[in-house]
C-alpha cells in the first residue's frame, strides 16, 4: 500500500490506479541483478515465492526481460529469469513495435502502447510485467437501476455520473471509526476467488486522511471487521487509465540506491548499467456486469465497526481495492474525478 500512498499524495484531486503485483514483479527482476545496498533496498519489494503463479481464471500475469543482443549477462541472473529472457536489438525500431504488440495482446488491447517512444541505443535491458483481470460480479447490477446521480468531487463541486444501484442484497460491510476519520467499508464479490473492497469516508472531503493511514495492516484489520448484512449499494460506473513514472515515488520510499548511476547491478552483467526509468500503465473498467483491469510496468536499464447502516452510496471520492480471497492485493485505486476518466 505504500507505493499507492506515495503516488496518491503527489496527485491530489486525480484518479489513481495501480497494480502492486505488476510493480513488484519488475522490482524482483531488478533485485536478481542487484548487489550491495541496491539489493538490500530492493529486497523489501521482492515478490514472495508464495505469491508467484497464482494466476486464476480472472487474473493472469506475464513477465518478460529483453536484453541487448551484444551484452554479456551473468549466468546466475539468467538462471533466475529463466525462459522469460530474450535477446533483442534495441536499435531496431521494430523491437519497440514487437514489445508493444506483446503487451497489447496479453492485456486484450487495454495497454497500448506501453512504450511511447523509441528506446535509447544505450538500453541494455528492458524488464516488463503485465497483468490482466476480468471478472463478473457474483451479484451483477441491473442496468435498469443505473441512472444519473450527483457525485461530489468536493463539498462545493458536483458532477453527474452513471450510478449503478443494487437493493437489499447481503454484503460484508462495516462502519469504522478511527482517530483520523470515520468511514464505511464494503466487499463486493466477483465470481471466483476475488472481490472489490470499497472504502468510503463519511465526509465528502475525508479521503486524504484515510489514504495517509492506508497500510497493509490497517486494511486487513478493517476487512476483518466486516460482517454480512443486507444493504443497498450505489457505485459509479467508471473507466480510468493511468500512466506513471514510478522513480520519484520509489526514491521517496527509500529506494535511493536503485535508480541512476548509484545503482549496483553487478550481478546482472559485466558492464556498468543504470535504471533510468520505471513506467507503469494501467486501465480499469467497472460496469454493471464485470470489472476489467490491466496494468503493465517496465524498467529501462541503461548503460473497527460501530453503528450499522443500510445504505452504501459512493457519491464522493473513495478508495477501491481488488484482492484475492487469500488477501493478496491485485489492484488499488482512488476514484475522485469523474471528468478525467
Swiss-Prot record:
One of its GO terms (biological process) is symbiont-mediated suppression of host cytoplasmic pattern recognition receptor signaling pathway via inhibition of TBK1 activity. Pfam families: Serpin. GO terms for cellular component: cytoplasm; extracellular space; host cell cytoplasm. Signal peptide: none annotated. It is found in: Host cytoplasm. Keywords: Host cytoplasm, Host-virus interaction, Inhibition of host caspases by virus, Modulation of host cell apoptosis by virus, Protease inhibitor, Thiol protease inhibitor. Its main location: host cell. One of its GO terms (molecular function) is protein sequestering activity. It comes from the Viruses. The record marks 303-304 as: Reactive bond. Viral serpin that inhibits both cysteine and serine proteinases involved in the regulation of host inflammatory and apoptosis processes. Major anti-apoptotic protein which inhibits both intrinsic and extrinsic pathways and strongly cleaves host CASP1 and CASP8 but is a rather poor inhibitor of host CASP3. Prevents the proteolytic activity of host interleukin-1-beta converting enzyme (ICE) and ICE-like enzymes. Can also block apoptosis through host tumor necrosis factor (TNF) receptor. Belongs to the serpin family. Poxviruses subfamily. This is Serine proteinase inhibitor 2. The lineage of its organism: Viruses, Varidnaviria, Bamfordvirae, Nucleocytoviricota, Pokkesviricetes.
Amino acid at each position: 500500500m505504500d507505493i499507492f500512498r506515495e503516488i496518491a499524495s503527489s496527485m491530489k484531486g486525480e484518479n489513481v490506479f495501480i497494480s502492486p503485483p505488476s510493480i513488484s514483479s519488475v522490482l524482483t527482476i531488478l533485485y536478481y541483478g542487484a548487489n550491495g545496498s541496491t539489493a538490500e533496498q530492493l529486497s523489501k519489494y521482492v515478490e514472495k515465492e508464495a505469491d508467484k503463479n497464482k494466476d486464476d481464471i480472472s487474473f493472469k500475469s506475464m513477465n518478460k526481460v529483453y536484453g541487448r543482443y551484444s551484452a554479456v549477462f551473468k549466468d546466475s541472473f539468467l538462471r533466475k529469469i529463466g525462459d522469460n529472457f530474450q535477446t533483442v536489438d534495441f536499435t531496431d525500431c521494430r523491437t519497440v513495435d514487437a514489445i508493444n504488440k506483446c503487451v497489447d495482446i496479453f492485456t486484450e488491447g487495454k495497454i497500448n502502447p506501453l512504450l511511447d517512444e523509441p528506446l535509447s541505443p544505450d538500453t541494455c535491458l528492458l524488464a516488463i510485467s503485465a497483468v490482466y483481470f476480468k471478472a463478473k460480479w457474483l451479484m451483477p447490477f441491473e442496468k435498469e437501476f443505473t441512472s444519473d446521480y450527483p457525485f461530489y468531487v468536493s463539498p462545493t463541486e458536483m458532477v453527474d455520473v452513471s450510478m449503478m444501484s443494487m437493493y437489499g442484497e447481503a454484503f460484508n460491510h462495516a462502519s469504522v471509526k478511527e482517530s483520523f476519520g470515520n468511514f464505511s467499508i464494503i466487499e463486493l464479490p466477483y465470481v471466483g476467488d476475488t472481490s472489490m473492497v470499497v472504502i468510503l469516508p463519511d465526509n465528502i472531503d475525508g479521503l486524504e486522511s484515510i489514504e495517509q493511514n492506508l497500510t497493509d495492516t490497517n486494511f486487513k484489520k478493517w476487512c476483518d471487521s466486516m460482517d454480512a448484512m443486507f444493504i443497498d449499494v450505489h457505485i459509479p460506473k467508471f473507466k480510468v487509465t493511468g500512466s506513471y513514472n514510478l522513480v520519484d515515488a520509489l526514491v521517496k520510499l527509500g529506494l535511493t540506491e536503485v535508480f541512476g548511476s548509484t545503482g549496483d547491478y553487478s550481478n546482472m552483467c559485466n558492464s556498468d548499467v543504470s535504471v533510468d526509468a520505471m513506467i507503469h500503465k494501467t486501465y480499469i473498467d467497472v460496469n454493471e456486469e464485470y470489472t476489467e483491469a490491466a496494468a503493465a510496468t517496465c524498467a529501462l536499464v541503461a548503460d473497527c465497526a460501530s453503528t450499522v447502516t443500510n445504505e452504501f452510496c459512493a457519491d464522493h471520492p473513495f478508495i477501491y481495492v481488488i484482492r484475492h480471497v487469500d488477501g493478496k492485493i491485485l489492484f488499488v485505486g482512488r476514484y475522485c474525478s469523474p471528468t478525467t476518466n
